[in-house]
Regions:
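Extended intrinsically disordered or low-complexity regions, especially N/C-terminal cytosolic tails and loops
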Residues: 1-84, 92-94, 142-149, 169-224
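Flexible secondary-structure boundary motifs
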Residues: 84, 92-191, 195
Length: 224
């Protein structure tokens, strides 16, 4: 991957990680497609083989049906893990942006530091919301709210496997408002049903980070 000249360290790192996620999703989607095509082709041949008895047909079909079932279960786990990774990419990138542009995260949180080293020595932990407050102060773009509320709640569900009424309402709103995320509700929970959905979430997160860094640059210029 080629990094454009003139990029900041934040931009270069973001572009590298985003491209890596995109390429990984592409490979996973292709692998899934190839497995399904081969298994379904084998099933088609078995189903249409008139020389087989019903018992023989069932016996020969079973390993391919099992393969498809195992493939889908594996894909569900992989998609869940990737979503968690995508949100971590968002959180850590916000932290890096604040550090790179020397934004006063502690001050926005109401913490007064006597020395710059105090932040490191006291190991003060900041949240995603703290970094967002340091970048956007009071008003946040809609795309940032989508990430920090809706996608965050979906990540929380994928991490913990549980959802109270509020979280369910948020995820249900994702299903209705963002069909390109490919989130599906079944009797036993919520699932991301396509790698394309994760690629679309990646694009939203990447766009949000571009806006965050652009805003941080402006703040940095104003401060200096």
């Amino acid at each position: 991957m080629t990094i454009a000249k003139g990029c900041t360290n934040c931009e270069a790192e973001r572009d590298t990680i985003a491209q890596g996620f995109h390429e990984m999703l592409k490979v996973l989607k292709q692998a899934k497609g190839q497995t399904e095509v081969q298994a379904k082709a084998a099933l088609y041949d078995i189903i249409n083989d008139k020389s087989l008895s019903d018992d023989e047909r069932w016996t020969q079909m079973r390993p391919f049906n099992d393969l498809l079932s195992e493939q889908e279960e594996s894909d569900i786990r992989i998609r869940r893990t990737i979503l968690i990774g995508l949100f971590s990419f968002w959180e850590l990138s916000l932290k890096y942006i604040c550090a790179y542009y020397k934004l006063d995260v502690a001050g926005m949180k109401g913490i007064k530091l006597k020395k710059e080293s105090q932040l490191k020595n006291d190991r003060i932990l900041f949240s995603e919301n703290d970094y967002l407050k340091a970048i956007f102060h009071s008003e946040r773009p809609n795309i940032v709210d989508v990430i920090s509320s809706k996608i965050k709640e979906l990540r929380n569900y994928m991490t913990h496997g549980s959802a109270d009424k509020n979280r369910q309402a948020v995820i249900d709103s994702i299903i209705s408002e963002y069909p390109d995320f490919f989130v599906k509700k079944t009797h036993d929970g919520y699932y991301i049903t396509s790698y394309d959905g994760l690629d679309n979430i990646l694009k939203i997160i990447n766009d949000g980070l571009i806006i965050a860094e652009t805003t941080a640059k402006t703040l940095n210029v104003q401060i200096n």
